[in-house]
């Protein structure tokens, strides 16, 4: 699976946002255990510097989370890559993301040619993400809503990616997962979280295991404009 993103010249970047800098990030991710080449290529292609404030652009290709306002962050590239790599293992076509945030995770999935649906509870963040998707020519379906309820009318989904942590996996989201599908989500409280992978088998059974320790902002209910 190869990235399908056609970038405008301004997305290519110069200096601290150049292709050479992105290649170094990909090398670090590979050294940190990311092995799926499609995932690494998507990380290389998607311009992370366009998903953060211009003042932080020089840090865009560091392997670290960065603030995006409203108490939210753009996830660490390793975490984005690990979640992407995990869901690609089930060869999904339709993916639900809970928590659009900056839009970066959705863009990585979209660059891989997946049909992406993403839900965000904070209206201002979603409006900014939509502008980025349009600028990159990405056809990502977006919705301003409480992410904890998912997007049932477009389900079931082959994969679900949750980008904020809840004390336990959300049953409503599990119900929107197709047979043979995979959900990846951070689970835990402020002091300790784990990235959990849940698989719904063809016989309807559920199997889950922990991928890695992580740190995410909390998954909140309700909506903000």
From Swiss-Prot:
Keyword Cytoplasm: yes
Keywords per UniProt: Cytoplasm, Methyltransferase, S-adenosyl-L-methionine, Transferase
Catalytic reaction equation(s): [protein]-L-isoaspartate + S-adenosyl-L-methionine = [protein]-L-isoaspartate alpha-methyl ester + S-adenosyl-L-homocysteine
Gene Ontology process terms (BP): methylation; protein modification process; protein repair
Residue spans crossing the bilayer: none
Active site: 75
Pfam family, one: PCMT
Record EC number: 2.1.1.77
GO MF annotation terms: protein-L-isoaspartate (D-aspartate) O-methyltransferase activity
Protein localization: Cytoplasm
Transferase keyword on record: yes
Cellular component, GO annotation: cytoplasm
Record's function text: Catalyzes the methyl esterification of L-isoaspartyl residues in peptides and proteins that result from spontaneous decomposition of normal L-aspartyl and L-asparaginyl residues. It plays a role in the repair and/or degradation of damaged proteins.
Classification via HAMAP family: PIMT
Family assignment from sequence similarity: Belongs to the methyltransferase superfamily. L-isoaspartyl/D-aspartyl protein methyltransferase family.
Protein name per the record: Protein-L-isoaspartate O-methyltransferase
């Amino acid at each position: 699976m190869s990235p399908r993103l056609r970038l405008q010249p301004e997305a290519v970047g110069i200096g601290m946002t150049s292709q050479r800098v992105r290649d170094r990030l990909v090398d670090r991710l590979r050294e940190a255990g990311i092995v799926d080449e499609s995932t690494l290529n998507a990380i290389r292609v998607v311009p992370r510097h366009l998903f953060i404030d211009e003042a932080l652009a020089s840090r865009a290709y560091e392997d670290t989370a960065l603030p995006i306002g409203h108490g939210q962050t753009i996830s660490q590239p390793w975490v984005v890559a690990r979640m992407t790599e995990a869901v690609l293992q089930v060869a999904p076509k339709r993916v639900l993301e809970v928590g659009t945030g900056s839009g970066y995770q959705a863009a990585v999935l979209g660059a891989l040619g997946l049909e992406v649906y993403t839900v965000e509870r904070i209206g201002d963040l979603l409006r900014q993400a939509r502008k980025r998707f349009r600028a990159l020519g990405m056809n990502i379906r977006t919705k301003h809503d409480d992410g904890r309820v998912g997007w049932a009318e477009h389900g079931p989904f082959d994969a679900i990616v949750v980008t904020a942590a809840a004390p336990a996996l959300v049953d409503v989201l599990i119900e929107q997962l197709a047979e043979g599908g995979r959900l990846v989500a951070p689970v835990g409280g402020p002091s300790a979280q784990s990235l959990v992978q849940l698989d719904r088998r063809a016989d309807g059974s559920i199997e889950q295991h922990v991928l890695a320790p992580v740190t995410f902002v909390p998954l909140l209910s309700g909506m903000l404009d």
